[in-house]
Structure formats: C-alpha cells, structure tokens
Amino acid sequence: MTDAIASVLDLLSLRPDRVARLKDVPWGNGNWLIETGGRRAVLRRYHPGATPEDLAYEHAVLGHLASAGWVVPHPIGDPVCREGLWYCLTRYVPGQPATPESPAQRRRRGRDLARLNLALRGLGQRLGQRPGWRPQHSAVAAYAGLDWGACVRQLTAVSPALGSWARAAADQTRAALAAIGASQLPITVIHGDFAEWNVHYRNGRLAGVIDFGLAHQDSRPYELAIARTYRAPETADAYRAELARSGWPLSELEEAAIRPVYQAFRLDMAAWELDHGLKTGDYDLTAIERQLSRTGTPPP
C-alpha cells in the first residue's frame, strides 16, 4: 500500500483488513480493493483532470442506476481530495468480464447495453451535459479540455507526416458527419465505455457494470462505437433488436451515422494520444498511426 492510499484511508477513517491494487493507470484512474470485516468496497482515484462538478455528474448517473436496481460502483461516502487528486469509496461490483467473448456472449452484452440505455433514457433532461464534455459528432474530441490545435501543432513538430494526416482526418471526419446531418442526432446519457472488460457476469448472468468515467450525453451510434461493436457485430445486432423490441429503435439518421461516428471515435482516440504527448513529451507514434489508420482517411 502506497503512502498516498494510506493517507486517503486515514482521511476516510478506514482501518481495512486488506488492501489490494486492482488498477493504477498513470495519468488516469486507479482502483484498490478494500476489505473490512469480510465486506468489500473499492477505493477509486480519479484522473488528474477530475473536478467536483465532474464527479457530481458521474455520481448522479450511478445513483440513478443504483436506485433502479443496477449493480454499479456508486459512492458509499463523500469524495476526498489529497494533493490535488480526488478519491471516493465505492460499491464493490462482483463477477468478472467475459473475455474473450463467444458470439452468444457478445449478443448478451448487446442486450444488456440496450437495457442500460433504456434505464438512462430521459436522465439527460434532468442532468444536462457533463461539465467539460460534448457529443462526439460536434467536435474532434468529446472532452472539451483537449486542445486539438495545440496537439496537432506539437505532433507536426515531432512527425510532420503524422501531423498532416491528423489534419486531413479531422477535415474528412467533419465532412462525413456534415454530409449525413449529424448535428441533428439525438443525444442521451450513455455509459461511454461499455466494452467487454467493463461488464461483469457471474453464473451466466449480468452481475454489474463498472467504469462510468466517460458517461455523458452523446449519441447512440457513439455508444456503439466506444463499446467496440465494430469488432463484435453480434453485439450491435442484439442491441438494435432489444431497442426495437422495447419501442426505442435506432432512427434512419442514427443508422446512417454509425460509420462516420465510428471514424470520429477513432479520431478522438488519436487525439487522446496526441494530448498525452503534448503533456508529457512522450509520443507513441505507432499508436497514433494505428488510430489514424482507422479513421477512414488515407495518409497524405
């Protein structure tokens, strides 16, 4: 256990029997399993850019779902701040992700994503947009704190070829979204990362959903993109079918937006790599090239 975690536990007046690191991503989130008297909880450390307003939004989403019977990592105490980083004790979510998924498991995840979106439907009317976020189809990056212009300028200084490619990809992505009228896409509160590793199952049944760090108002095509359904078509098909069965099918515009929004998602992934390089000076050029290659824009 690190000094930082020990200090946070003191702030929370916790004396656990056991502390185990689950995940600790530099410049990102961290999670530690806390066991006390046979009961489990998870101490979450939020990324350096998290603000009280940002966390309040995420916790409101979690509270809404928990009230509706979903097993999610909702807070079981107030957040505390140590050396500029926010921490919060949250509910432990049991089960394990199904990785790798079988076709049947992919279909199951698609149905569960549809059910989650149905549970969140209408919540945006009360919460509005998450502070600092916007729909993916409205900008290069869904996170408004990312300075795309500065990112591309610095990338160009490091790799002129990749900088030129990034600019071209941004132009082509904007054009593709404009061509289908993406500005008219309806938005709703989404999970924001319903990939297989964030969905827990136990004994063949859904046990819970974790990691709502990217939850915000966005389009359902973006939810499909960031759920990585491009490599799990069974998930997308089951998602469509469950929504249609529940009376909330994807519209023609949403169907038309799936491909260009996926390409916008890939550009956003590249933008995060650029942002990391801008902040640290460490550029993973291979990762940047890989993301740009998936935007549908060929290298210039």
Which role does the model predict for each range below?
Residues 142, 149-155, 164, 269-300:
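ATP/Mg2+ or Mg2+-diphosphate-binding catalytic cores
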Residues 88-96:
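Short pocket-lining segment of the protein kinase catalytic domain that shapes the ATP-binding cleft
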Residues 21-25:
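Protein kinase glycine-rich loop
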Residues 27-38, 42-43, 75-77, 174-222:
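Active-site acidic catalytic loop and adjacent metal/ATP-binding pocket
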Residues 1-20:
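Juxta-kinase regulatory segment immediately upstream of eukaryotic protein kinase catalytic domains
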Residues 220-248, 263-281, 290, 294:
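Active-site activation/catalytic loop segments of kinase-like enzymes and analogous catalytic loops
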Residues 44-85, 100-115:
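A conserved alpha-helical element in kinase catalytic cores
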Residues 100-164, 187:
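A cross-family kinase active-site recognition segment
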